[in-house]
From Swiss-Prot:
Reaction(s) the record says it catalyses: GTP + H2O = GDP + phosphate + H(+)
EC number: 3.6.5.n1
Disulfides per UniProt: none
Single GO biological process annotation from the record: positive regulation of translation
Function (record text): Required for accurate and efficient protein synthesis under certain stress conditions. May act as a fidelity factor of the translation reaction, by catalyzing a one-codon backward translocation of tRNAs on improperly translocated ribosomes. Back-translocation proceeds from a post-translocation (POST) complex to a pre-translocation (PRE) complex, thus giving elongation factor G a second chance to translocate the tRNAs correctly. Binds to ribosomes in a GTP-dependent manner.
Signal sequence interval, chain numbering: none
UniProt keyword terms in alphabetical order: Cell membrane, GTP-binding, Hydrolase, Membrane, Nucleotide-binding, Protein biosynthesis
Transmembrane segments: none
Pfam families linked: EFG_C, GTP_EFTU, GTP_EFTU_D2, LepA_C
Binding annotation for GTP: 23-28, 140-143
The gene coding this protein: lepA
Recorded topology in the membrane: Peripheral membrane protein
Official protein name in the record: Elongation factor 4
Domain tr-type G: from-to ranges: 11-193
């Protein structure tokens, strides 16, 4: 292809993504667009065509990004090349959204015409605005009896400040308005800018591991051209590779001769390790490198940590392999080996948030068949010691002695809750109970309110989201962003079973709520740990001070069963003998802890 042809083709490329809150019909709309542009035959067409993982289909959410190239013949007679990038809508995956948005020039903003704007819609719109994208509002689900498209249009204008006068009214389920959406993409989304003859610059926005071809990098070409056989360099890591093949997704991977400015496709180059093709990194030519990398790359830092241990200790190496494999596709997963007296060998893993953590656990159990025990999730605390040094703690067991600590800081988040008028009280009560600090409250229209609180992340990590949903009958939507660290009165609470500390059950709690938490946890463990042949005390302690206790009663065999009547001293002798045996057992006895016990430490809501 000569340069003029490249430039002509470039003017017909439109790169866009779809952003929406969970369940507003994003993947369904993507299905309709694939259908309308003839990307899939009827036989291949299935619900959520771009969601490849079983888990995505089951939960009805999008976890990984997907990119497709589509051909569309517009009303002006030209054939346009669309690159549609489907993004996750969940708050844990915002960084995947931000990367896919960086690969686009435009975004379709989908708003449910019955529910209106939700908290994550806002979060994603701000990400799109940060990337200077052209945003096209689409009011979806207009076939619902409860749809109020005019109200929602007004909301889009008032809350986001977008002009919604020519927003497309659509129903992705029934295929209404799809044509209008595609025409708007042609008219309003700008063609990619960039020089095909300049040194190569390509943004990696996702990577995937294939056992035969190594790492497959999903890329968007910003400048220059790339062909098989060329040498490339990763600008963050400085490593060099030779390109084996380049191609596009239609949604199936199809090889092509070259990728040039504006193309969204894939590249393989015998890259063995996914950490060599970091998401957000820039690929350039090794022979004629670009001067500077594309902006916006940042390493994703985990927000939530927890321990993963195999139930069967022989599975340890399989678990390591599973984590290595998942890490290949998931740049934000971090892990390191750790040991626990109670659980043996395992890994301390870092995740972006709770949904991310659940999904990784579920994928390990499903795809690799390993049964797991997970410990309570915790966040990263900054501990300043009396000698002036600051250390970071992501595991409660590593918390230093109270005498050595000067103060502890914990991460705070700014949480935005959008909720119908009737539930404002319930939401405020919940936020207050989680040590929230009230910031602001705004009425979006006559019956929807946006409430902003600053809450410690550790309070959100447990069950904030579940409680929020149940307190508002599922109507609230929620989004959070980290705002920094603040000093708090935090203490480490240990749980003792039979006088032994169980390291995996330790939690870091606020001093004011320690007594309450201790009492609840101890009672819960009493119910969940099976009764032993001997009496087991369950205690919660802060340092050496016991703050709560409960006792699991022993199971007792009736040793008097075969004494019919008879002398009392004979019975007493048997009972004394039994008592001696129990005492001996108690001294050497080990208590098995079921998985539910670890989760009980977290779930404080069903007191």
């Amino acid at each position: 292809m000569n340069n003029d042809q490249r430039l002509e083709r470039q003017s017909r490329i439109r790169n866009f993504s779809i952003i929406a809150h969970i369940d507003h019909g994003k993947s369904t709309l993507a299905d309709r667009i694939l259908e309308r542009t003839g990307a899939l035959t009827d036989r291949e067409m299935k619900e959520q065509a771009l969601d490849a993982m079983d888990l995505e289909r089951e939960r009805g959410i999008t976890i990984k990004l997907n990119a497709v190239q589509l051909k569309y013949k517009a009303k002006d007679g030209n054939e346009y090349i669309f690159h549609l990038i489907d993004t996750p809508g969940h708050v844990d995956f915002t960084y995947e959204v931000s990367r896919s948005l960086a690969a686009c020039e435009g975004a379709l903003l989908i708003v449910d015409s019955a529910q209106g704007i939700e908290a994550q819609t806002l979060a994603n719109v701000y990400l799109a605005l940060d990337n200077d994208l052209e945003i096209l509002p689409v009011i979806n689900k207009i076939d619902l009896p409860s749809a109020e498209p005019e109200r929602v249009k007004k909301e889009v204008e008032d809350v986001i400040g977008l002009d919604a006068s020519d927003a497309v009214l659509a129903s992705a389920k029934n295929g209404i308005g799809i044509e209008d959406i595609l025409e708007q993409v042609v008219e309003k989304v700008p063609a990619p800018a960039g020089d095909p003859t300049a040194p190569l610059k390509a943004l990696i926005f996702d990577s995937l591991y294939d056992p035969y071809r190594g790492v497959i990098a999903y890329i968007r070409i910003v400048e220059g051209t790339v062909r098989p056989g060329e040498k490339i360099r990763m600008m963050q890591t400085g490593k060099e590779f030779e390109v084996n093949e380049v191609g596009v997704f239609t949604p199936k991977a199809v090889k092509c001769e070259e990728l040039t400015v504006g193309d969204v496709g894939f590249l393989t180059a015998a890259i063995k390790n996914v950490s060599d093709s970091r998401v957000g990194d820039t690929i350039t030519s090794a022979v004629n490198p670009a001067q500077e990398a594309l902006p916006g790359y940042r390493r994703m830092n985990p927000m939530v940590y927890c321990g993963l241990y195999p139930i069967d200790t022989n599975d340890y190496n399989d678990l390591r392999e599973a984590l290595e494999r998942l890490e290949l596709n998931d740049a934000s997963l971090q892990y390191e080996p750790e040991t626990s007296q109670a659980l043996g060998f395992g890994f301390r893993c870092g995740f972006l948030g709770l949904l991310h953590m659940e999904i990784i656990q579920e994928r390990i159990e499903r795809e690799f068949g390993i049964s797991l025990i997970t410990t309570a999730p915790s966040v990263i605390y900054h501990v300043t010691l009396t000698d002036g040094n600051t250390i970071q703690i992501d595991n409660p067991t590593n918390m230093p002695d109270p005498q050595k600590m000067d103060h502890v800081e914990e991460p705070y988040v700014k949480s935005t809750v959008m909720v119908p008028n009737d539930y404002v009280g319930a939401v405020m009560e919940l936020c207050q109970s989680k040590r929230g600090i009230f910031v602001d409250m705004q009425y979006l229209d006559e019956n929807r309110v946006q409430i902003i609180y600053e809450i410690p992340l550790s309070e959100i990590v447990y069950d904030f989201f579940d409680q929020l949903k149940s307190n508002t009958k599922g109507y609230a939507s929620f989004d959070y962003e980290l705002i920094g660290y603040r000093q708090s009165k935090l203490v480490k609470m240990d749980i003792l079973l039979n006088g032994e500390k169980v390291d995996a059950l330790s939690v870091i709690v606020h001093r004011d709520s320690a007594y309450e938490r201790g009492k609840v946890i101890v009672e819960k463990l009493k119910e969940l740990i099976p009764r032993q042949q001997f009496e087991v005390p369950v205690q919660a302690s802060i340092g050496t001070k016991i703050i709560a206790r409960s006792t699991i009663k022993a199971i007792r065999k009736n040793v008097l069963a075969k004494c019919y009547g008879g002398d009392i001293s004979r019975k007493r002798k048997l009972l004394e003998k039994q008592k001696e045996g129990k005492k001996r057992m108690k001294a050497v006895g080990n208590v098995e802890i079921p998985q539910e016990a670890f989760m009980a430490v977290l779930r404080m809501d069903d007191k």
